[in-house]
Amino acid sequence: MQREKIAIAYSGGLDTSIMIKWLKDKYDADIVAVTGNLGQQKEIENLESKAIATGASGFHFVDLKKPFVEDYIWRALKAGALYEDVYPLATALGRPLLAKALVDVALEENCTMLAHGCTGKGNDQVRFEVTFASLAPHLKVLAPLREWEFTSRESEMDYAIKHNIPVSATKKSPYSIDENIWGISIECGVLEDPMVAPPEDAYQITTSPENAPNEATVVEIEFEQGVPVSVDGKKMAGLDIINRLNELGAKNGIGRLDMIENRVVGIKSREIYEAPAATILHFAHRELERLTLEKTVFQYKKNIAQDYANIIYNGTWFSPMRTALDAFVDDTQKPVTGMVRLKLFKGSVTLLGRQSPYSLYNESLATYTEADSFDHKAAAGFIQIYGLGLKTFSEVHPAK
């Protein structure tokens, strides 16, 4: 019989670190660990040696930063995708790309199974497995966290200690942290009580607003067809733009989010996020759309933004619906070109100005000075026709 070969999505965190040994022992299989680089800063050093020492027979480190920015983040930004009007979907956006990378390696290595380290009540299990089903439906999927004997992160840490598996989580600091260039999610520990304010040690990159500089930072961001192309007049690649805005935003306490969100499985969970660049760029992009999009397009696109956010959050990135919405979004973004000037100060983002060659703002129509060119007399007829339906209704059904 062919020996089983399992490709696992390997982050180097607590769950996936102990998962290598657990799977190897349970299935007597060869383990191929696959790490996708989405711009995370922590737990990426010595991953190969750590995976091999833990029992993996192979390791792949896949640089996904460029496609993550250009094919995922920018699409979500153009769509205005914020889950439940708050979360910029950093973790959710990365999952389909990580799952695709895992499938690609599994096919290359002739693996017979795919494995992930997602919990049985979280969102990521759905995102990974729906992507697997879309891209490689013939491969068997394993989800150890849904079946193994460990009932808490503390028991997982005990297993790691027993088998000399190095992990960064400790019983004193038990946070579960997921990081990529678009944002960081932090959960577990005291954060599970929604009445407990996040301890300062939970935050990974941002300065607290109280300790942020007393002098504001002014930043100018230029967009072309909805995509950021420069910061403070300097043209940059997308990755560099996000890095720069993460740096400026983190220094000024921007991007701390504390929300109760509705998970895919129906559970409400308390999530802490840090997303400086995402917060800044979504704000700037929306303000530029206010200036350049026709009224009905701007208002209708708000509905599309929620639909798009739900597609990302619910794990159906590789779907015809997302592709169809991309076509709509891309068409709306043709005039979203221009510059937005912002002030970053102690946790807040304030608009200072915006301009665009496609601006629909007409000062001669908007002004109340002598330069006013609006025909005020035309308003009477407009109002009469606009309200005619309600007037007719009220004549038949008078108010009581």
Swiss-Prot record:
Record key words, sorted: Amino-acid biosynthesis, Arginine biosynthesis, ATP-binding, Cytoplasm, Ligase, Nucleotide-binding
PROSITE patterns per record: ARGININOSUCCIN_SYN_1, ARGININOSUCCIN_SYN_2
GO molecular function, one term: ATP binding
Residues where L-aspartate binds: T119, N123, D124
Binding site for ATP: A9, Y10, S11, G12, G13, L14, D15, T16, S17, G117
Pathway field: Amino-acid biosynthesis; L-arginine biosynthesis; L-arginine from L-ornithine and carbamoyl phosphate: step 2/3
Entry's localization field: Cytoplasm
Superkingdom of the source species: Bacteria
Protein EC: 6.3.4.5
Reactions accelerated catalytically: L-citrulline + L-aspartate + ATP = 2-(N(omega)-L-arginino)succinate + AMP + diphosphate + H(+)
Gene Ontology biological process terms, A to Z: argininosuccinate metabolic process; L-arginine biosynthetic process; urea cycle
GO cellular component labels: cytoplasm
Annotated residues for binding of L-citrulline: Y87, N123, R127, S176, S185, E261, Y273
Quaternary structure and partners: Homotetramer.
Similarity remark: Belongs to the argininosuccinate synthase family. Type 1 subfamily.
HAMAP family given in the database record: Arg_succ_synth_type1 (MF_00005)
Protein name per the record: Argininosuccinate synthase
Annotated organism of origin: Chlorobium luteolum (strain DSM 273 / BCRC 81028 / 2530) (Pelodictyon luteolum)
